[in-house]
Amino acid sequence: MTTGTDVRISLRLLFYELWDNNAKLTKNKTTTPTTSKTTSKILFNSKRTTPTHGYDADYIAELSNNFEFAGFTAPTPHNIRKAFTRLKIMFERMNRYPDEIFLSRHRMLGFVIYQPETSGPIPAFHPKCKFYKLSDNHTHDEKIEIVKNHILNGEIVKTVDLKIDQSFESYYYDKSNAQASQKFLASMHTCDFSFLSFPYINDLTATELGLLPEWAAILLSYMKIINVRGIYNDVVECIDPSQQFCVFEIIGSLTGISNGHFWSVLNDRRSMDVIAKEVEKIALDNQPFXKDGNLNHLLFNSINLSDPLNFNIFHYSFKLKIFPTTLNPLDDLVLLRMKDLIKAFNAGNDVQVIGNKCIGKTRLTAELKKKYLNLLIIDSDDYGKFITLLLNNCPNLFLNNDFEINDEVFEEEIFNVTVIEYANVIRDGTIVIETFFERLMFEIMSLNLTNGEYDVDAIFHSFNARFHAIVNSSMIGYRLFFTKFRKLMFDNFNYTQVLHFVHSYSELSFYPHCVAYITLEPSYNPCCLLYKNRVKRFLSITRSDKGVSSELFLHQFYEKFTTKVNPTPVFVFRYYFGLTNGLSISELALDENT
């Protein structure tokens, strides 16, 4: 069992009671028979007429599991509803909440009952019910303090003072309807408030937060909450003008020829002279690109000012020079598109990011998952991997090379079971699945290889026809998979929003939920990494002294279907989403032994 210190509870799950099918409680206010004319009217859901029934069984189970996993006892949905009713009245009367109920586990909280002298005695509502009769022999301020202390002790304070009645959560005991009054007041008094002191994660979207009633929005400021959607706090309007801008020159150690210039923002407040001397000592010699630091760190935190860097991944040796600059090469249209994407993201919408192979989506995914815990990152290879899994479950899925579906063996249930299986694979994170489209590309390449030469046009034409036959399928297509996959992940794992990586512009239309997109551009030539990766992949083949993989052909295919108008540098995406503060020289100086 984990403890509440390392796992936090879903705020969206707690606030379920504020939504009808996750929509708002009805705004029709109803006065209960026990509510004083001077007290607040009570919001309640007209569709739920019984206090212990009518709650969705899946919600109850998920609520219990979520609290238990965090190391706490879950409140019942009915208890949460009662607590929200009382909290609303508290806020309307006091314009605040008692701090004490959020600091320690206050199980029972008292309230005020207005009792005119003529109303007669009030019986105990339940065995643990305790009353305190407020004397009139005190000043108003003294009465306020006395009432507060007794309420925090769980006692019901009886008073004839209307000013006190109107300063606290208060009710009226209706002697003419004693049975109903006792039942209602007993239910309110036995409400357990201890769940307010538990830690929560704010997994509500910006739209949902904006729809919260005032009492609920203010309630959040009292609770122990971590905002998992860090974009609300960390998104920036522009590059921080107080940071230093710089240009790096990368020079081949053997040739002395400049291999490129890169612009960056320094996450380093030291003087440029000190930084320049430190940079001169850095030698980028045969460092594996996959390691943090050095070339990897430089390229992910900078923008190329010329052609993307080309290099032999297996052997390179670079020297660095750094120059201060006031230049900001970012195109206004690039920044406008970036801000439009963030605006849509902050509003709770799903967004898409176009990124071809080997531009760094794996690293971005890891960073985004760490920062935005309730953001579902859909990888550009997810659909291809799903098709591989589907073929494992239904080997005779396709009738022919045109990928017509074999209706005699394929059933919808196979598709649904495979979606669940793939979700478990994603959650596990250790199972490696090849994407079907790499295998398909390899087979097409093999059929179009003559005398050691590839017919590139024929390869792309054949792959394009087969690729779109699969993704457009009404039975196993792209849209169907992602719709079911998204719903499954949202329903079972508390995801609230999607960031969907795709390979090319042509894939945007297949995903129905996104309202904004950008195209990412790396500061290096991704083909360098594709050559490196070929030696590790079983689909690779050799032509003369160079490795040509299906991945490289896929990269070129996707490139044909991606517009390069105003692309967004990877560094800009990382900076605006709060994934980096700029280039750290200390990380750049790391060698392979650190």
UniProtKB/Swiss-Prot annotation:
Q: Which residues form a coiled coil?
A: none
In which domain of life is the source organism classified?
Viruses
- Grouped into one coarse class, the protein's main location is virion
Task: List localization entries.
Answer: Virion; Host cytoplasm, Host cytoskeleton
Write the record's keywords in alphabetical order, separated by commas.
Host cytoplasm, Host cytoskeleton, Virion
UniProt keyword Amino-acid biosynthesis, yes or no: no
Which Gene Ontology terms of cellular component type are present? host cell cytoplasm; host cytoskeleton; virion component
Range of residues in the leader sequence: none
Q: What does this protein do?
A: Minor inner capsid component. Displays NTPase and RNA 5'-triphosphatase (RTPase) activities. May function as a cofactor of polymerase VP1. Associates with microtubules and plays a role in the formation, structural organization and morphology of viral inclusions, where the assembly of cores and the replication of viral RNA occur.
Instruction: From the Swiss-Prot or TrEMBL record, give the protein name.
Output: Microtubule-associated protein VP8
Source organism per entry reads Fiji disease virus (isolate Sugarcane)
| Gene responsible for this protein | S8
